[in-house]
Design a protein with these regions (language model features):
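ATP/NTP phosphate-donor binding region
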Residues: 1-99
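Glycine/threonine-rich beta-strand-loop-alpha-helix active-site module
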Residues: 78-137
């Protein structure tokens, strides 16, 4: 497993982690940042079947409570309506500025979650767990 820290300014610290089966390591790294213990995971139906439960289990074992937000599969859902539905769900869940959003999926999920994290409450912490090569670049 490789890690590279990217710091652009005092508020923006990014850590790039490369490796296989990085769920445990990613959750451990979340603990290093000053984030709330409540988080929301954005994923789609396909990815949720394979990877959501291990992530939820690891988060719970580290003291996090997590809610999942499942979005439809497909490029056609990368739009403001879907982003708006995610934002509405975050409000319903009581997510605040310290609560991280975790994107678990391909390009559509990572792009949508990144956009939502940047506009929700003037920005919230974001962790990307890409599951496709395109989402990684």
């Amino acid at each position: 497993m490789e890690s590279q820290r990217l710091e652009f300014n005092r508020r923006s610290v990014n850590e790039l982690i490369l490796g296989n089966d990085i769920v445990k390591d990613t959750v451990a790294r979340l603990l290093r940042f000053r984030v709330g213990r409540h988080c929301a995971i954005v994923t789609n139906e396909t990815v949720a079947k394979w990877y959501l439960q291990p992530l939820l289990s690891e988060l719970k074992s580290r003291g996090f409570t997590a809610n999942e937000i499942i979005v439809p599969d497909g490029e056609k859902y990368k739009n403001y309506e879907t982003a708006s539905s995610i934002i509405n769900r975050l409000c319903e869940l009581g997510i605040d500025r310290d609560c991280p959003l975790i994107a678990l999926g391909g390009g559509v999920v990572c792009d949508l979650t990144g956009f939502v994290a940047s506009v929700f409450k003037r920005g919230v912490p974001l962790a990307l767990l890409p599951t496709s090569l395109l989402a990684m670049v």
